[in-house]
Regions:
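Active-site gating loops and adjacent loop-to-helix segments of metal-dependent hydrolytic enzymes
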Residues: 1-5
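Active-site catalytic loop in hydrolytic enzyme cores
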Residues: 9-22, 38-119, 125-138, 168, ...
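Helix C-cap/helix->beta junction micro-motif
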Residues: 26-27, 143
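Short beta-strand scaffold segments in enzyme catalytic cores
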Residues: 34-35, 50-54, 87, 182-184, ...
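Short acidic/polar active-site loop segments enriched in Thr and Asp
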Residues: 119-120, 146
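C-terminal beta-strand edge segments of enzyme domains
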Residues: 152-242
Length: 242
């Protein structure tokens, strides 16, 4: 199974990476994609990285983040990432950043993005269950930013045929193993779009009140008037592991 995952991994500068860049360019959108990343040479060439790619509407790669720490059993599959991707990308509608799954429980990872005046945060999860919703709402409130919490949809029938399945699952091809839960949260921590479960549809949301990211910072600004640089020394090693 691991060999198959490695074979099907995405090389950022390879065919699959170029395909994602072409999609962003063709549809003139900012595209954020979570991938199982493989590299052909150097550090991690026999491993996978849990990665997040940000493309601009011109197809250029704006940011490439590798999850800092594989979580629990993920350590069987993934190598550790680095701080190179702990940054935001400037867009016409504000700066955008993102974290992967349990990185949202790492306070310093959150602070690294808060310090860069993040306006839109992409929180990617396997499925956005209750605790993940809580982490996403907390991030929005703490960072005074909009959060797009994205959850995967996976049904039994989507699994590779090579995987042996218990009889109960064989008889339920439409059963959800990952049931989504995607949502959109405002800078006050309130839902703009309630969690959407058990559906595989494209959701379109219009955000017009961009000033709310400023208004909410009157009461809480964790990188400004609610931060104590005289007490805490904050720095990030943003070097890419070669």
């Amino acid at each position: 199974v691991y060999a198959r995952m490695l074979q099907n991994g995405v090389e950022v500068k390879g065919t699959s990476g170029r395909f994602l860049a072409d999609l962003a360019r063709r549809y003139q959108v900012h595209l954020v994609a979570g991938i199982n990343e493989k590299v052909s040479k150097g550090y991690g060439n026999g491993s996978l990285f849990n990665s997040l790619l940000f493309y601009g509407p011109d197809g250029n790669l704006l940011n490439h983040h590798r999850k800092l720490m594989p979580t629990f059993t993920e350590k069987l599959l993934y190598a550790a990432g680095d701080g190179h991707g702990l940054k935001t990308a400037d867009t016409p509608f504000g700066s955008i950043g993102g974290l992967i799954c349990w990185e949202h429980w790492m306070p310093l990872s959150r602070q690294a993005l808060h310090m860069q005046n993040e306006h839109i945060h992409v929180a990617v999860w396997p499925a956005v269950k209750d605790l993940h919703q809580m982490a996403s709402r907390h991030y929005a409130f703490e960072g005074r930013c909009y959060v797009i919490a994205a959850g995967q949809i996976l049904q039994v029938k989507d699994l590779p045929e090579m995987l042996p399945l218990p009889e109960t699952l064989q008889k339920a091809p439409d059963q959800y193993l990952l049931n989504g839960g995607s949502s959109v949260i405002g800078p006050d921590g309130a839902y703009i779009l309630e969690p959407q479960f058990d559906m595989a549809e494209i959701l379109y949301i219009t955000i017009e009140d961009w000033e709310s990211t400023l208004r909410e910072r009157m009461t809480l600004d964790v990188s400004g008037h609610y931060f104590r640089p005289d007490v805490f020394d904050f720095q990030v090693n943003d070097k890419r592991n070669a």
